[in-house]
Amino acid sequence: MIPEEIRAELQAHARAEAPNEACGLVVLRDGKAERYIPGENAVASPYRFELRTEPENWFLEDEGYELAVFHSHPSSPPKPSRADLERAGLWAARPWLILRTDTRELAAWRLDDGSATPIPLD
């Protein structure tokens, strides 16, 4: 579940980074988002992202949190692109949240072996 205040933060970050993709981490506990940690898109591209975040953010998982990878698609559907599927790497085991910036549509996915499975947001 993604509360409205977290959705608003995702939308604000996506708008601020447009026309490039924004990215960051959503911190979840028991399936509910508790906060958003904005990251930096190291490639500053409207077509792909490389998340740069402080290393200590990854240790939140050791404290019982789940981390979801967030990024925006400036004007394409909120589903994993070919680039997303090809570059999932170590993030494939985590939930992915994708926001279409121009419509504010948000979707969640689980990526595995080059395929994507939708995850309910409620």
Residue ranges and their predicted role:
Residues 1-66, 75-122:
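Conserved beta-strand-loop surface patch within small alpha/beta domains used
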